[in-house]
Structure formats: structure tokens, C-alpha cells
Amino acid sequence: MVEPGNLAGATGAEWIGRPPHEELQRKVRPLLPSDDPFYFPPAGYQHAVPGTVLRSRDVELAFMGLIPQPVTATQLLYRTTNMYGNPEATVTTVIVPAELAPGQTCPLLSYQCAIDAMSSRCFPSYALRRRAKALGSLTQMELLMISAALAEGWAVSVPDHEGPKGLWGSPYEPGYRVLDGIRAALNSERVGLSPATPIGLWGYSGGGLASAWAAEACGEYAPDLDIVGAVLGSPVGDLGHTFRRLNGTLLAGLPALVVAALQHSYPGLARVIKEHANDEGRQLLEQLTEMTTVDAVIRMAGRDMGDFLDEPLEDILSTPEISHVFGDTKLGSAVPTPPVLIVQAVHDYLIDVSDIDALADSYTAGGANVTYHRDLFSEHVSLHPLSAPMTLRWLTDRFAGKPLTDHRVRTTWPTIFNPMTYAGMARLAVIAAKVITGRKLSRRPL
């Protein structure tokens, strides 16, 4: 075994091509990313091309950090790019189906979790690991969806798409991290996937936002990748509108978390906060950087961000600095190259359906191949599992190269009225039972 730090003193890029690897250490409590040497790239990493694996390790995964999963998981630290074009490094967790024999290949799904926080406790590379202390992270529950993809016989890449600083809401760079995570998975000899592997994207809510950035960026940023389809579940099409919608509600912690993160990406926003936020507001934003998603929602329930300002909130939101941030973070600046399936609840209390209508129209007008499922009966949380069977079948068809003969731009037919939903949900219930009890998943496509 090569220790991660052994190459850190190298100058230039002479270590590229021989990334060190850590073998599996069982029952070891993981360190937080901020304290874990694995996350710190070696000297000269900026000379590597995006997607280069910098180091790797085998890890144990567990549901809610407690129930070990009998899966093969490898974490890859890789070189990627932030929104300003500067090099950075982040981690993806790659899981391969248990039944995949050496030399065999399979489709690769990049699954983007709803990290929705700055705290590294919520990063998938930490929260999915055995003995992780990540209470309040939404990421831990998403192991159920990841397992459903594994049961299809697909390999799954789960990137820390917010990057090493957890910059939730920042534009463009989540897509770069997703795409470079895919490159890293294909480049890794430890994972053993073919470079010609067909690739899919899937994410919901905050994960849908990251998936949308990847779908928009892949044509220009990663034309080398064979991305055959992207599923964008309730993808937060307009952060500015969502801020206004949720501020002062029971979910006010979500836009507050976004502001806490975006001030690190936009100097203009940081300057406005410094000039107009009171001491309590600045202290609160600092505390939010360490909170999990659930912690922040509980702490901020019903709070109005205007209470922490010296001027009316709407006046602050109308300043050029804030208008620039909200304009920059709005999806639709580019058109996805691969076909996309957009899933959105009409009666979503978190994401306004009109924002997603506008996004779907923008993509379609730009020439994208869009299937838009506009669900009449579901709401934000329930639609994710209810739409999973449809999502998995749609991705299966894309991996198989089937043409999109049924090009639906919009439908209000509820998922719950589709008989196939119940067959799929029954299958997902079996998968969930196996995950919760720590039993091995066998390949059994929907």
C-alpha cells in the first residue's frame, strides 16, 4: 500500500499516471474531509488534465452510517475545474455491481445527491461511509436510489459535486465536477470500466440542479464522454425565484444555506453582506457553513432574511450585485447535448413548476430532445421515489440505444396512475429492504 502523502512533495507533474492507492481498512471511522489527508491534492496536480485520478482508496459504505453494505466501493480524488476555470480537486465514490466479472463492462450512471449544505458531513464521500456521523444529511437516504441503479447492473459514480468547500448553488462548476468525476471513473484502473462505456446522469432537487449543469456543459466541456441521457428531477431552475419563494417559510434554511455558500463565489455578494447584514446575520451565515441540511432547516424555520439587514430585503435583492448572482445561477445558459427527462411536481411547495416549465421550453427551443413529465398529484419529496421506476426504464432505453419515438414535451398524467409505477415501487421496496438489512443486491432490472 502506498501512503497518500508519499508523492505530495513531488514537484511539477512527475507523479501523474501513478496515483497512490489505499487498500480497504475495515471498521475505521472516517475523518471529516476537512481533516482527511486523502482530500488534499499533491503538489503539481494543477498540471494534470481534468479527470485525472490523483489518488484512490477502497472504502466501506453503510446505510445511515450504521448498516454495512456488501458492495465494492472505490473513492477517487481527481483534478477538476471551478467556475472561474481554476484547477481544484474533489472526490467521487464509484460503486460497481457485485456480479460484474473482471473484463466485463456495464453502463455508468453518475448519480448526483442533494447535498444541499456546505458542511462536509453532507458530502457523499463522507456521508455514505460506514461509521460516518452525518445525522441531518439528506445524502444518506439517497443510498436507496443508488442501490436501485446497482440492481440494474450499472456502475455508479457519486461525486462531491459541490467541491471541497461545499459551494452549494454556484453555477457551472457542479457540472464540471460531475463530468470530471465520470472521466476519473473511466480512467481508473481500479474501477476497470471501458472508455466506451455509455453514461447516464440522474439527480433530484439539489442533485437535479447539478445534473442539469452537467447536461448543459457536456457538449463543450466533455465531448469525449458518451452521455446518452440525463434525468433532471425538480432541478431548481431559478435560484433567485426559489429564494423569494422560500424565505420566511418553514424551509427558509435552504435559501439561507445558498446565500452562505454563494458569498464565497461572488465577491459582490460578500461585499453586500458585509455592508448591510447586522452582527446576528453575519454570525448566522458563519454558523450555517457547519450545519447539515436538516439542522439548518430546523434552525431557520420561519425566519426572514430581511430581519438581518439594515435595509428592506427587496431593495437589497434589486442591487446590481445580487441581480448578477441570481442571473448567473439560473439554469438555461446552454442547451443539453444528450436527451433529457425532466421530472417536476405541479404542486411542489419547494420548486415553482413555472420555473421548470420555462427551463423545459428553453431547452426545447434550443433544439434539445426533452421529455417533460409534469406530475399533477405528487409533491416534492414523494415524486423522487415515485418517478424512480420511470427514470430507470428511461435510462435503460438510452443505454440500449433505443430511439426516443415518444417525444413528449409535457404531460400532466400522474405517475401514481401508471400501473408500471406499482410494479417498480414493489421492486424498489425489495431493494430498500435489502439495503436496510445489509443484504447483498442481485442484478434484477425493472
Swiss-Prot record:
Record's SUPFAM superfamilies? alpha/beta-Hydrolases
Q: Name one GO biological process term.
A: lipid catabolic process
- Please name the Pfam families in this protein's record: LIP (PF03583)
Q: Which GO terms describe its molecular function?
A: triacylglycerol lipase activity
- Top-level lineage group: Bacteria
Q: What induces it?
A: A possible member of the dormancy regulon. Induced in response to reduced oxygen tension (hypoxia). It is hoped that this regulon will give insight into the latent, or dormant phase of infection.
Gene3D superfamilies, per the entry? 1.10.260.130, alpha/beta hydrolase
Homology family: Belongs to the AB hydrolase superfamily. Lipase family.
Q: What else is known?
A: Was identified as a high-confidence drug target.
The name this protein goes by in its record: Probable inactive lipase Rv1592c
